[in-house]
From Swiss-Prot:
Function as written in the Swiss-Prot or TrEMBL entry: Involved in the cell polarity process where it is required for the correct termination of microtubule growth at the cell ends during interphase.
One MF annotation (Gene Ontology) recorded for this entry: zinc ion binding
InterPro entries: Nucleoporin_NUP42, Znf_CCCH
Database matches in PROSITE patterns: ZF_C3H1
Protein's UniProt name: Nucleoporin-like protein amo1
Zn-finger segments (C3H1-type): 1-25
Main location group: nucleus
Biased composition range(s): Low complexity: 183-204, 243-252
Keyword Metal-binding: yes
Compartmental location: Nucleus
Matching PANTHER family: NUCLEOPORIN NUP42, NUCLEOPORIN-LIKE PROTEIN 2
Keyword annotations: Cell cycle, Cell division, Metal-binding, Nucleus, Zinc, Zinc-finger
Region (Disordered): 165-208, 220-252
Amino acid sequence: MVVCKYFLQNRCRYGTNCKNQHTVPSNGQNAFSKVNVFRPENGRPPIWVQRRLKRSDLDNLLPNRRMKDINDDLKNAKPQWPFTGYSVVENLPSIYEGDVSPEELRWWAYQAKATNNMQAYEQRQKQLMDDVEAKAAAVKRSPAAAFDEMRNKLVGKTNYKSIFDKSTSNSTVTSNQFNKPTQNSPFNSFSNNNNSFNNNQQANDIFGAPTTSAFTSQLNASPFSQNTSSNSFTGSNPVQNNPSSFGSSSFGSATSGPSAFGGISQPNSSFVNSGQGIPNSSFSSFSQVASGFSQSQNVNDPSSIFGPTVASGFGIQNQPQQSAFQNLNTQFSLPNNSQPVFGHTSLTQPVNPNGFTVQPPATFMQQPQGPFVPPNTTFESPFANVTSKISASGFSNDNPANKNIIQTPMFGSSNTIDGPINPIGASSIQTLDDQVEMSNSNQNLAFPPEMIQQFEAQDFIPGKVPTTAPPPQFC
């Protein structure tokens, strides 16, 4: 059979199931190439070591020349995590053990913090550190005895004196967690204790202090309801007066403590034990407006939209209420003397609290009037090219004395206009006399020669198109 080369390199992935042969070289030079192995597990020797390795082969696997490297390994090549075992050759048992993972220490810290026993955790951590340092010091003092310790473990010898007996005599609780009797179960914190789910029992935690189980049912006040000693639907036996966090007990029990929601809880009776039947409302016990966590309502509260009051299923007694669809003063059935929703009407005027009568706002083209507006005040029209002196009438100027008055317009030049003023601006209708007067005005104008040439041209030239009315000789 072919020898497995990966086994000689100590990286065969198949182990005992490999189809090639796993043999240990007689010289021991290539079988184990890695020295000073710090490993986090305390595993047993491999199966091939227990079956095939002889005492004569140990001298080849563990030559004396490697003993001098132990001091260097423990001094210079020591890993950062202190709670780690040490072996001079890979795949062989550790010379000394003391492996504790960071997860284990973290779990112990959580346990200590939960039971308020951090002092025991710190003491246990110090003991573990002292134990590992004592074992390392024993190996450095006698490396030859450390190799004999490994040989005895490999051959399965048990009746030998360990070199770590003196170093570990001052640390008698190495296998114990926190001064607790050592147990064989991997879950030793639960082996000799009571069931965690028993009622009214106390369980001993891993720190030795009796604590209450997280799942134990104690006779304490529940944060959500009251502890009752009878069926909540019968109402025959009295209940305890432990206040509930929500202010009301379950299904009709009387409460006397304050509610966590601010409502005033008073002794009420529900439909379960009050002698009343189940209400006939089609909305059952949830048809009332009042919530089980709110205060008692009175007649002045808003009316229910579902009609008459029914008994609450949560012990809240409601006062008689009226339906919103009956003869109520709602927004849909306002009386005749009520005020409109969007302000006062046009028939009435609001009263000024200062004692003055408020005039309604001016309409379109109507001038403001009031106690602060003097009479015969001139206002400018924002739409016309001319302005006029407007009297009380906003549509005409009937006073003959106001004619032929030139006033300053708002948007441009103005002309003197006799007669009534157009209320929507200057007159856009021109009479025949106005057109004749406009045509006669062009006869008196002196056109420049270049403009005369534009009118005399046979074709339109861009930039030289006349933009005014032609003179009379071209008409």
